[in-house]
Swiss-Prot record:
Substrate binds at residues 27-31, 77, 157, 212, 333. One of its GO terms (biological process) is protoporphyrinogen IX biosynthetic process from glutamate. Keywords: Cytoplasm, Decarboxylase, Lyase, Porphyrin biosynthesis. One of its GO terms (molecular function) is uroporphyrinogen decarboxylase activity. Homodimer. This is Uroporphyrinogen decarboxylase. Its main location: cytoplasm.
């Protein structure tokens, strides 16, 4: 196994001491970077980019070449799994993802099956290629994160046929035919576990489950239709590979009211959106998990001084509840395509500098 030059991200997920707070950004390889847009133009389409391991490797490394980030995340899409199930994924310009064959009837659901992981080999090849490309002077620069959508979030797209403002189609099925929804979610959970395990086998050193639409569910429905199936995913995961622990991060956007229950399904870390107070979240989870987050992504449209002030606020909030260890800095959701790249430099600089000062006792956490 190649040694890591920088393992702060993995140590933070294990709640071990780090010299500073590590960070990475959701969608860090994306449309806000001109170099990403140039590569995407060469690929011809988003799917042409995501399904080509060489292109996926190139764009995964682009933010690391621009910023001193502490982790890389596989460039892919959460909808690769339902695409492999035969739902016919496409991306229309300006419209987002669409499925040609959404799950609308009992017959549709009856035909659904866990896909052959060989049909997703392009993802696993990308993981392997990225791991190799991260090696510099005989050591790997930073760890690589693999990921998947949660069973519920995948089901939202699979039933709606694309994105939605109100999820009325998938929710109507959930309320009217819970048996069909449970079948979809059970298949999705099995598929997600297998998909993440294959990423781990290919070289992912941590994995994240994106429950982007869990927060759209009512209390009670969340536990039954999202959390229960993320628990099943985690129960099926390899938590160790090649002699190394594989940390697992779970992120439910809008899930702040359920932190204790999310911690109860056994992740190593919980991702938080910007509506959650970090100090309170830390007290509520009683140090059982690391926390990841959680600055509002739109802060990156503000002035340099405002960005630095907001970064310090996030770091101070976490540190005020018992020191800085066990925190991975991130945005509360994905970075906007309109973000000025130079503002990301300011954020990264302030995270590293202020968190070092907190640990050295040069500044006190403002409460």
């Amino acid at each position: 196994m190649t040694a890591l030059q920088n393992d702060t991200f993995l140590r933070a997920l294990r709640r071990q001491p780090t010299e500073y707070t590590p960070l990475w950004l959701m969608r860090q390889a994306g449309r806000y970077l001109p170099e990403y847009n140039a590569t995407r133009a060469r690929a011809g389409s988003f799917l042409g980019l995501a399904k080509n391991p060489a292109y996926a490797t190139e764009v995964t490394l682009q933010p690391l070449d621009r910023y001193p980030l502490d982790a890389a995340i596989l460039f892919s899409d959460i909808l690769t799994v339902p695409d492999a199930m035969g739902l016919g994924l496409s991306f229309a310009q300006g419209e987002g993802p669409r499925f040609a064959h959404p799950l609308r009837t009992e017959a549709d659901v009856a035909k659904l099956a866990v896909p052959d992981m060989a049909s997703l080999q392009y993802v696993f090849d990308a993981v392997s290629e990225i791991r190799k490309a991260l090696v510099q002077d005989g050591r790997q620069r930073v760890p690589l994160i693999g990921f998947s959508g949660s069973p519920w979030t995948l089901a939202c797209y699979m039933v709606e046929g694309g994105g939605s403002d109100d999820f009325r189609t998938v929710k109507a099925m959930m309320y009217a035919r819970p048996d069909l929804m449970h079948r979809i979610l059970d298949i999705n959970a099995t598929a997600v576990s297998a998909y993440l395990n294959a990423q781990i086998e290919a070289g992912a050193q941590a994995v994240m489950v994106f429950d982007t639409w869990g927060g759209a569910l009512a209390d009670g429905m969340y536990q039954a239709f999202s959390l229960a199936y993320m628990r099943k995913v985690l129960q099926g995961l390899k938590r160790e590979h090649d002699g190394q622990q594989i940390p697992v991060i779970v992120f439910t956007k809008g899930g702040g009211i359920w932190l204790e229950e999310i911690a109860g399904i056994g992740p190593d870390a919980i991702g938080l959106d910007w509506t959650v107070n970090l100090a309170k979240a830390r007290r509520r989870t009683e140090g059982r998990v690391a926390l990841q987050g959680n600055i509002d992504p739109t802060v990156l449209f503000a002035s340099e001084s405002a960005i630095r002030e907001q970064v310090r606020g996030v770091l101070d909030s976490y540190a005020s509840a018992g020191g800085s260890d066990g925190h991975v800095f991130n945005l509360g959701h994905g970075i906007s395509q309109f973000t000025p790249p130079e503002n990301v430099s300011v954020l990264v600089d302030e995270v590293h500098n202020h968190s070092r000062k907190l640990r050295a006792g040069q500044v006190a956490a403002a409460v």
